[in-house]
Regions:
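Terminal low-complexity/charged segments
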Residues: 1-143
């Protein structure tokens, strides 16, 4: 009977995590080069890449993330709304995407003022319909 080698498994896990971080850094560099005028900020946190875009560029960036051969973020996981009552740009939407092909996740966020209408992404991700309605119900954000 072979004993479970915990040290070896731990080393494999660390190697996997290092590879994942390296891939996220490459993706971050790629996105910043391809979408340089559209990305306001990007950072890697909790093994996920977060990019911030202006709400006017939201649909174009999401279409790129889904259709680009190096990205392949073809699954929308969720849309979350955030309310910052004291900020000028009071609301933030955070879109969570998954690429099965690349085994990676990305968060895309956009901030905007109260009463701004945000472009819907239901033509790109039909499943966004339900999520956008939930955001409207909770925050009054219109799409």
């Amino acid at each position: 009977m072979e004993f479970y080698n915990f040290k070896k498994k731990l080393e494999e896990k660390e190697t996997y995590k290092d590879n994942m971080i390296d891939n996220l850094k490459k993706l971050e560099t790629y996105l910043n080069s391809e979408l340089s005028v559209k990305i306001q900020n990007s950072l890697i946190e909790n093994n996920e890449l977060l990019i911030e875009v202006d709400q006017k560029d939201l649909v174009q960036v999401i279409q790129f993330l889904k259709s680009d051969d190096k990205c392949k973020f073809r699954q929308l996981i969720d849309i979350a709304g955030v309310d910052y009552p004291s900020d000028e740009n009071r609301f933030e939407l955070v879109y969570l995407f998954l690429s099965h092909e690349n085994n990676s996740r990305i968060k895309l966020s956009t901030k905007f003022k109260i009463n701004q209408i945000i472009n819907s992404i239901t033509k790109i991700f039909p499943s966004a319909n339900w999520m956008e309605r939930e955001v409207f119900d909770m925050y009054g954000i219109k799409f």
